Amino acid sequence: MPSARLDVPDDTSWVLWHFLTNRSNFMQNDLFDDALPPGDAGTPASGQAPGADAARRAAVQPAPTPPDLHALATALPAQLRMGASTWSYPGWDGLVWDGAYDASVLAKKGLQAYAQHPLLRTICIDRSFWRPLTVSQYVTYAGQTPADFRFVVKCPSVITDALVRAEDGRGREANPAFLDPALAATAFVQPTLEGLGDQLGVLVFQLSPLSWDWLTRPAELFARLQALLTSVQSQLISHPQVIVAVEVRDPELLVPAFADVLRATGATFCLGLHGKMPPIEEQLPLLRSLWPGPLVCRWNLNRRFGAYGYEDAQKAHAPFSEIRSPDPHTRTLLARTIAGITGRGQRAYVTVSNDAEGCAPRSIALLAEAVLEAAAQAPRAR
């Protein structure tokens, strides 16, 4: 039986309407949903009495920081910012939080404590990928962090996905708003600038996996991407601190023409470390072709789980308190890349998921140590 369709205008506005009324349900367990009243601290974590320590649960407190962790953070290059992909994980008890908190509490109130961790100087706002956020939501994020904290924000997929998708993620039809400059301005760039201000660090345009139809028309794809990035950069003239990065999910796009577009528009390539893309050493040539320039990297998933292994990784890594899938190969090469780029005065933003190795804060600490080791071994720039 064919699905019913509503008559809506044939322009990009209907795509945004469809996205907000349908695609937003794709992530049904969105921990950041605004349905939780601002004054509700959520339920206590497992093992806590319902009325215990209510005052403490009203605001999430940071875990005490060992002196060696402070020393490690101080020794890192000032140009380097590392952080996680979201922060609402009770398993970070003792690492980031001072005790056991429910995930809903951390989602609402944990960012302030997260931002006090000396190694966590940025965060990736993944939520914005699933639906556009409002200025007030970005203002709330900024208000929970110190002035020196920076945000990496993902563009809504209504702009970066070539397909309009059903709730199960399957493509239903072509997306007429794909890489639309006007929609990107109103639904992404303007709200982030207004809400985050000087704390906006990186705008990430993650292109969802493309159909073969698009992959066989790279010239048209890159022309559309260049038009989008040119428009975005025109809105950032007064915000030179903002880096624009493009992440792809198709290895076929790692070609010189892609680098030409990035170079022409002042954007950079976002290293995407997961099973859908080649290992880091096979992505670095494209990044090198853009030198000099900043580094943006999202270390999302250990390659041992394959291209579609997020669910398996979640099961293997929960509750995300320990390193369970160490990846020294990726860590070492990433550390060398960070050391080389920051050692020459360029900025580096690196966000790490729990699914990279099992626990993002521990992965970041290990990466920090590897960066210092790589910097000590690297020849000094002259």
Where are the regions that the model predicts?
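Extreme N-terminal basic, low-complexity initiation segments
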Residues: 2-10
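Residues lining hydrophobic/aromatic ligand-binding pockets adjacent to catalytic sites
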Residues: 12-382
